[in-house]
């Protein structure tokens, strides 16, 4: 993930993007929905397997690894939706972000958080993804 865009309007104006991992954050539900729809615009949602994970669950690492490694019997592609509701980071969440960042997968990964501030995202989370 070499090019990071934190402006939703710039992202929504993009016609093509090559990234497979998206961090969607903010407190405006309508913009979150628009950003998700834009990231999924090129996908036929009837033909993808959807996996929903909660980053705060104790077995997140195991579930995430299973999601990216398992093959679907019926679908070619997989979209992994990851939700984070906490408003602050801890070492387990940072480890989870590192796990996601280091994952080498063709699956589309959408991480959604509404409670973590932009300051924390810019300072603590984006550098994790920039290093990979």
Task: Give residue ranges: language-model regions.
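Short hydrophobic/aromatic beta-strand immediately N-terminal to the Walker A/P-loop
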Residues: 21-25, 81
